[in-house]
Amino acid sequence: MEVKKLIVHCSDSSFGTSEEIDRWHKERGWNGIGYHFVITNGFFISGKPYNQKQDGIVQKGRSVDKVGAHCRRHNRSSLGICMIGKEHFSDAQRIALMATVLELCGVHELEPGDVYGHYEFDDGKSCPNMSMGVFREDLGFRLKNLRTNRSYTSGGKK
């Protein structure tokens, strides 16, 4: 699968893991988890206490070489990243999201303009409930710095 974009989502739940989302999706009659990555918030199970060690963990979902099931009309050309939560995300989650997107941009030669929120493809969605414009601006700054430093440390070879 040729990856042309990354699409960020939220789980619209206060807790969860990639395994839990896989179960939820199967209960809806789907073929398992539709996202390729899940970023946890420290609440794995409903009603259980927060676990700081489990906050901001990037879990694998659907294999990256398989077409996702997360954004109608864009699944064949994108990877889906789901943040556990709805409107508020922890610092650990935001750091993990940026690190994951930076890595995927490097692997797939993507630019900030190739990273979207689900709401940008579906007027009925607000997911991931964060400003993707601000995220892309920060991503662009970080990508530029990474690429400049990589070029400098590798003798100009990229």
Place the predicted regions along the sequence by residue.
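Basic/polar, cationic surfaces and motifs that engage anionic cell-wall
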Residues: 1-7, 11, 41-60, 75-158
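Short glycine/proline-enriched loop/turn "hinge" motifs that connect secondary-structure elements
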Residues: 68-76
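Alpha-helical scaffolding within the catalytic cores
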Residues: 61-69
